[in-house]
C-alpha cells in the first residue's frame, strides 16, 4: 500500500482484564487476518505463560487490511500492549511507534489506575486518544457513569465514545470506522534516506535477531545493507515483512509502516531496542529519539541448583535481555548458593514471569533469593553508594545515613472500600498526600516506602478491596529511615542469601516471624537445628527444629536407671558430634519465606 494517508498505526491501552486481547481477536477476524479454523482466543498472546495467566506480557504487532464503508482500503498496524503495572515500559515502547491509541474501558468496572497512567504517557507523547467502552453486553454495564469517569479522571471528552462488546462482536465495526477517522495518518517521506526505530527484538535460533521496526522515512527491502546506529555495524537484510498475524514476507517496508527485519545478526546485542536503523549509504541520518530506559525497582539473586548449569544460565539471560530490555543482571557469588546472577526486575510479577520463562524455555532449575530494593547510603567519608544486596551492606559504623526509596502511589478505589485501603497504607508506613472524590470512586495518593510496596502490597490491596482497587506507582525520591540489617543464622552460621534490610520498628516482629516460618520449612535433621535472627551481634529471635531420634531405651525392658542414662548420654554425644560436621539442606521455599511474612 503506497499512500501514507491510508495507514493507521495504533495501540490499545487498557487495564488488566478489560478485554484488550479479545478486541484484538475481533479486529483480526473482521479484517480476515486468519481463517476461521485458525482463530483461537487471544491470538496475540503467543507465550504459554500469557495464556495461563490471562495477561499480555510482551508487545505484539499485527498488520491488517480494512475496507471502510466509504470503500477505501486502510492498512492498520496494531501494536498490542500489556496492562499490568510491572510492564509499563512495554507500553511506552509500543506508543513510540503509533500516532494514536484506543483507550479501552470496561463499561462495568470503570476507569482503573493503570489505564490512567498509560493514557497520560500516550498524551505526553502527542498521541490521539480515542475512548472505547467494552463489555457493553454485561448486565452491570453503566456507560453513562463510565463516560463521566473518563472525563473527570483522565480529562478527555468521552460523550460520544464508541460502545462495543468484543466478546459478541457487537459494535466492533463501529470502532474500526471511528478509528480510521479519528487517528491521524503517519507523516514521512519515501524518498528520504531510511530512518527506522527498533520497537522490539527477539532471538530466533535459525534466523538470528528478528527486529520489529517502525519506518519513519525512506524504505528498506531484501538485499539492502543496513547500519545499526549505536553499534556502527553493517548487516545485509535477508527479509522484511509484516505479521498478519503470521510471519508474511513483503517486497519492502516503507515510511509509516510497522514490520520486521531479519538481517542475519547473530550477536544478541547487535540490534538494541530503541536504536535507529539506516542504510549504509546514508550513515549520517539523525538518531531517532528512543524511549527512556527503565530502571529496575526490585533486585533478587538467581542461582542454578546445579553449578554445572551456570554457563547455560548466562546464555539464557543474554537471550532474554534481548527480548526484555528492562531485565538487568550482574554475576554474583554467595557462600550458601555458589555462583549466580543478581538480576534487576520491574516488580514482583516481572520477577515471577522471568523465573518461569527461564525454567520453561531454557529448562533450568533455579533458586531465587528474597527480593530487595536499592538503598542509598551516605558514608562517613562523604561518598554516596547504592546497595541492592543486603549481604553487601558495609559495616554500620561507617554509615552516616541510610535512605530508602519512596514511591508516589495513585490508588483508585470505590468509596465503600476506602477505609480498608487507608488502613493498609498506614500499616505500610504510608503518608497520605491527596484525596479526590470522583463520582463513586476515590483517588488517593500516598507516599509509600518501595520496600513495602514491591513484596505483597498489590495482592493485599486487591484482597482488602475485594479486587476493586487499582494501583499505579512511580519512584519519587530517597528518604532517610531508621533501617537495620537482619541476619539469619542457621546453627550459628550466617546465611548470606537470607539477609534482609528492614525498618527498625518492624525488626523484632519480622525476626520472630521469619524464624517461625523457617522452622516450618527446614526439614528435621538427625540433630537439633538452631535458627536465629540477629541485628549486628544481638540475637532478637530464636527457634529450633528438633532432632529426629531413635528410642535407644526400647531394648532395656525395665533395668537399672544408670544403664538407661548411659545409653542416653552416648546418643547425646553422637548427636553433638553430628551437629559439628552436619550440613543443613535449606529448601528453595525457605529462601522465599520472606515474601510470605504478614507485614
Swiss-Prot record:
PROSITE patterns: G_TR_2. Pfam families: EFG_C (PF00679), GTP_EFTU (PF00009), GTP_EFTU_D2 (PF03144), LepA_C (PF06421). Its main location: membrane. One of its GO terms (biological process) is positive regulation of translation. GTP binds at residues 17-22, 134-137. GO terms for molecular function: GTP binding; GTPase activity; guanosine tetraphosphate binding; ribosome binding; translation elongation factor activity. It comes from the Bacteria. Its EC number is 3.6.5.n1. InterPro entries: EF-4 (IPR006297), EFG_III/V (IPR035647), EFG_V-like (IPR000640), EFTu-like_2 (IPR004161), LepA_C_sf (IPR038363), LepA_CTD (IPR013842), LepA_IV (IPR035654), P-loop_NTPase (IPR027417). GO terms for cellular component: plasma membrane. The keyword Ubl conjugation does not apply. It is found in: Cell inner membrane. Gene3D superfamilies: 3.30.70.240, Elongation factor 4, C-terminal domain (3.30.70.2570), Elongation Factor G (Translational Gtpase), domain 3 (3.30.70.870), P-loop containing nucleotide triphosphate hydrolases (3.40.50.300), Translation factors (2.40.30.10). Keywords: Cell inner membrane, Cell membrane, GTP-binding, Hydrolase, Membrane, Nucleotide-binding, Protein biosynthesis. It catalyses: GTP + H2O = GDP + phosphate + H(+). It is a peripheral membrane protein. It is an enzyme of class 3 (hydrolase). Residues 5-187 form the tr-type G domain. Required for accurate and efficient protein synthesis under certain stress conditions. May act as a fidelity factor of the translation reaction, by catalyzing a one-codon backward translocation of tRNAs on improperly translocated ribosomes. Back-translocation proceeds from a post-translocation (POST) complex to a pre-translocation (PRE) complex, thus giving elongation factor G a second chance to translocate the tRNAs correctly. Binds to ribosomes in a GTP-dependent manner. NCBIfam families: lepA, small_GTP. Belongs to the TRAFAC class translation factor GTPase superfamily. Classic translation factor GTPase family. LepA subfamily. This is Elongation factor 4. It comes from Pseudomonas fluorescens (strain SBW25). The gene is lepA.
